[in-house]
């Protein structure tokens, strides 16, 4: 799936780009993104999200997450400091992408990657200020997704059911994305996404919304 409406242009006209990579839990997108950062010959920068949850052992503020108090997060949310944010009700915590994180990367000529869920991606697409490259990663079928989630061995039946229901709803938004990647092999998925980004360096920013 791609968007033919983007026109050719000199990449120096827009050196920084926003890239959204989404996909259901269990699709392997985090692994793909980590490998993409290492292997792709594009100046990538992974956006660091903000959260109200407590740091886990070994996590570093500003590197893994920006750890904010609930009060600070709410203050910044009211100031419209987030590109997108949401509360994960099952955890009682907030997560979001700070505008200054994105702006700093774009102004430095980086291709800023947002590894965010569909809800966050739709919020970005609805903001005319951003015209991101949008990529949806999934395992090819709901059956394969269920198999991968079960193989993790970390999900209760109720949690598994909830994740699959969320994934089914997220798949309904696939048409809002410019590119679809079926992650049957991490190496192949990384190669496909890297080629997409290399091709996009020759086009003007566009979005499919």
From Swiss-Prot:
It catalyses: GMP + ATP = GDP + ADP. This is Guanylate kinase. It comes from Rhodopirellula baltica (strain DSM 10527 / NCIMB 13988 / SH1). ATP binds at residues 23-30. Belongs to the guanylate kinase family. Its main location: cytoplasm. The keyword Nucleotide-binding applies. Residues 16-198 form the Guanylate kinase-like domain.
């Amino acid at each position: 799936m791609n968007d033919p409406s983007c026109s050719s242009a000199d990449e120096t006209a827009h050196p920084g780009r926003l890239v959204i990579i989404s996909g259901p839990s269990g699709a392997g997108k985090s692994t793909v993104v980590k490998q993409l950062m290492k292997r792709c010959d594009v100046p990538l920068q992974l956006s660091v999200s903000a959260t109200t949850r407590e740091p886990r052992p070994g996590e570093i503020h500003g590197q893994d997450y920006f750890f904010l108090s609930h009060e600070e997060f709410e203050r910044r949310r009211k100031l419209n400091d987030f590109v997108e944010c949401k509360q994960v009700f099952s955890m009682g915590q907030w997560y979001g992408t700070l505008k200054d994180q994105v702006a700093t990367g774009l102004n430095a000529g980086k291709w800023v990657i947002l590894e965010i869920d569909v809800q966050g991606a739709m919020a970005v697409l609805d903001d005319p200020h951003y015209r991101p490259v949008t990529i949806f990663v999934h395992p090819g079928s709901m059956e394969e997704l269920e198999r991968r989630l079960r193989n993790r061995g970390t999900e209760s039946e109720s949690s598994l059911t909830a994740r699959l229901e969320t994934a089914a709803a997220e798949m309904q938004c696939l048409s809002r994305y410019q590119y679809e990647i079926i992650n049957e092999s991490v190496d192949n998925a990384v190669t496909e996404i890297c080629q997409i980004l290399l091709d996009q360096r020759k086009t003007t920013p566009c979005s499919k919304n």
